[in-house]
Amino acid sequence: MQLKRISLISAALVAAPAAAFAQSTVQIYGTLNVDIESVEATGSATGALGSNFQSRSRVTSNSSNLGFRGTEDLGQGLRAFYQIESQVNLDNGSQGGAFWASRNSGVGLIGGWGQVLLGQWDSPYKVSTVRIDPTGDVGILGYSGIIGSTGAVTAGQGGQTFAERASFERRVANVIQYWSPTWRGLTGRLAYGTGDTNVGSTANGVSEASGLRPALYSGMVSFESGGWYATVSAERHKDFQPFNTLFAAPQSSGHDDGYKAGVQYSFNSTWSLGAVAEHLKYHADNISGLGAFERKITNWYVVGKYNVGPHSVALSYGQKGEEKLSGAGFSDLPDSKANQITARYGYSLSKRTSLYAFATRINNDANAFQTFGNSPITATQLFRDPARGADPTGFGLGMIHTF
């Protein structure tokens, strides 16, 4: 009997570590962010019929999402993790962009050396400054109306249109990322997006028959201490080709580069000030047989936020610089500046539920066509959204619930 008892204890001790290693955690989470808003874009420089977007009301589901994530302890300081996050269109229930794992989703490993993931995820360039925007770059208030933009909507799936291929606010498909551990407030991320051109006829809108192989390289470094946050980031898009489609010309090799810096200071959770500056450069090696072509733009953004009790107020201003064009017979594009002014008031009903009111306006010069980056107005002219010189304006009321 004593021998049997000892055997049972021994078996339990052997099984215990294996059971512990197999334990995992699973979390179901989500954000429901819906508003009713009035939007318009008037004042088009073209004067053509249909070049303006007349005022109308709409209900918008601003990046609402549902997700599942978890970890598994593998022992010896190593863990596996996963996340499956999908967009939820509460405004109309459509599946446009709202399919399984359509948002940040992946699987990977975490250790003392940092973590690595495979899947689809926001680029380090995008992540580096998104926290400086009080909205998290959501809806018509998002700073991607200016930052990361050339009059382009954000790219959720690596990009299939001109506008998306030109954007530097990207969720990158077919990506491998490395995130470093934090050391004395310093941390970094690196990413490589494959472009996945080996199967099918197109990737990122580039024909496989052209022989080009699109790829993305992105990296960031950030420092956080006390109330300070500072970051620098860079990103290159190889052969994304946002130009030749305009001229119906044979596609040629090229690259697009983005460089960005951001800083934020927060004081006692009462107020915060932030600023972002970036330089975007688009380069085609040989456009329409006329030689190399470059397009350069400098954008910047400033924001202030004040919190008192359940109330919060945020004001922001962003500006897109004039476009500098060179090569292939092009010269600088005059009247191509734009700016965006945004105001937002929030009221917290609880830790997970809040109401908000907002207003925003983008002022486009005659040759500019900036639009709301994450909730654009319907396209009216070629890839331009809205028409050249039209000024998108919006205001409304909304509600956010998280779980």
Predicted segments with their positions:
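Detector for outer-membrane/organellar transmembrane beta-barrel domains
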Residues: 212, 217-347, 359-361
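Structural signature of outer-membrane beta-barrel channels/translocons
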Residues: 15, 69-73, 110-112, 179-184, ...
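Membrane-embedded beta-strand positions in outer-membrane beta-barrel channels/transporters
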Residues: 65-67, 104-106, 175-177, 218-220, ...
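Outer-membrane beta-barrel "beta-signal"
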Residues: 387-403
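Gram-negative bacterial Sec-dependent N-terminal signal peptides
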Residues: 1-22
